[in-house]
């Protein structure tokens, strides 16, 4: 019986939230039709509205990704050596112990 009450409350709250979330469409549409589209939204120059990507920055990011993978694999190899052999492999002046 408690489960049925819980389900009823959850459904009622969900429906209430859905009703409150929908805006009054008639007023918004009338205002938009009267004023027209905003000039900042409309592309008046005919050009593309995408951001340009600098080639050097993109290349630098790719190089950083490659370097981080190499560093990670190197650290992983050092950890596995330490884990299986028990040797005192040093990483940046510290031991794994």
Swiss-Prot record:
Does the UniProt entry include the keyword Secreted? yes
| Subcellular location field | Secreted; Host cell membrane
Regulation: induction: Expression is induced during host plant infection.
Q: Which Pfam families match?
A: RXLR
Domain of life (superkingdom): Eukaryota
**Entry keyword set:** Host cell membrane, Host membrane, Membrane, Secreted, Signal, Virulence
One cellular-component annotation, GO: host cell plasma membrane
Keyword Nucleotide-binding present in the record's keywords: the answer is no
Q: Signal peptide position in this chain?
A: 1-21
Report motif location: RxLR-dEER: 48-66
Biological function: Effector that is involved in host plant infection. Contributes to virulence during the early infection stage, by inhibiting plant defense responses induced by both PAMP-triggered immunity (PTI) and effector-triggered immunity (ETI).
Protein family: Belongs to the RxLR effector family.
Q: What is known of its domains?
A: The RxLR-dEER motif acts to carry the protein into the host cell cytoplasm through binding to cell surface phosphatidylinositol-3-phosphate.
Q: What is this protein called?
A: RxLR effector protein PexRD21
Species of the source: Phytophthora infestans (strain T30-4) (Potato late blight agent)
| Upper classification of the organism | Eukaryota, Sar, Stramenopiles, Oomycota, Peronosporales
């Amino acid at each position: 019986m408690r489960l049925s009450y819980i389900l009823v409350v959850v459904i009622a709250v969900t429906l209430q939230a859905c009703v409150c979330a929908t805006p009054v469409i008639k007023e918004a549409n009338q205002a938009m039709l009267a004023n027209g589209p905003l000039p900042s939204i409309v592309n008046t120059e005919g050009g593309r509205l995408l951001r340009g990507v600098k080639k050097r920055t993109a290349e630098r990011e790719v190089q950083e990704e490659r370097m981080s993978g190499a560093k990670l694999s190197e650290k992983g190899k050092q950890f596995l050596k330490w884990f299986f052999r028990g040797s005192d492999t040093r990483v940046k002046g510290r031991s794994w112990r």
